[in-house]
Amino acid sequence: MNDRPFTHVIELLHKAGLRPTRQRMALARLLFDEGNRHLTAEDLHREAKNANIPVSLATVYNTLHQFTSAGLLREMVVEPGRAYFDTNLTRHHHFFFEDTGEIEDIPHNLVSISQLPKIPKGTAISKVDVVVRLRSAEQVKN
């Protein structure tokens, strides 16, 4: 058993060029120790409070944006005013369940795009993100 439970988090932060502060390490463990997931700053703040980690919502926001800038997370905006953070950095797309706000990964090879519009001169496509929005079948009928 590892005598230093934060060793992997410290290495992760160092590789990303971030100083491993106590709060960053605690939030990184919450984020990355459970595998791939999607969550908002409010979700992570709630998890931190439940784990007795003393951190403000502003610190959670700042840390998530630092992790995103360092390449540890991917930020997604799927509804106005609400950003989700994705720990899965591989190529993939998403289902967004409008009823619950949950997000589920779709492997990139299961989505096919046959044609894109002509892009403006002097630009290049950096990536294409697909978000498939889902509702319960009853809501779609109405």
Feature annotation, model-predicted:
Residues T40-N52:
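DNA-recognition alpha helix
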Residues A26-R29, D43, T59-N62:
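Amphipathic alpha-helical interaction segments
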Residues S69-N142:
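Non-DNA-binding regulatory cores of transcription-related proteins
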Residues V60-A70:
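Basic amphipathic alpha-helical segments that dock to polyanions
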Residues M1-D33:
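Intrinsically disordered, low-complexity serine/threonine- and proline-rich regulatory segments
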